[in-house]
UniProtKB/Swiss-Prot annotation:
It comes from Homo sapiens. It comes from the Eukaryota. Residues 1-77 are annotated as: Disordered. This is Putative uncharacterized protein encoded by LINC00471. The lineage of its organism: Eukaryota, Metazoa, Chordata, Craniata, Vertebrata. Residues 1-15, 53-69 have a biased composition (Basic and acidic residues).
Amino acid sequence: MSEAKDNGSRDEVLVPHKNCRKNTTVPGKKGEEKSLAPVFAEKLISPSRRGAKLKDRESHQENEDRNSELDQDEEDKESFCRGFPMSGCELETSCCVCHSTALGERFC
């Protein structure tokens, strides 16, 4: 009985409707080729700006390296103060001072 209800919907393939326009391309050009716009855009950039672009990239990489070093320093400070929750010490200050006085000896 379940076979009688099956209307063959599994065998149907959905085909998107076309917008009734003929797809045309420029004669001699395939639709899969890349556009030449980036080549022309590169020619429009002045030589001095090309050098500046390279310097911008290098400085961006240096800034990323510097930021990752700062993040690593912050992680080191956090691990330095780990185990002393709610002690009131700031990560920027030396925590050995407050912990050494509160606990009697240095744990850092």
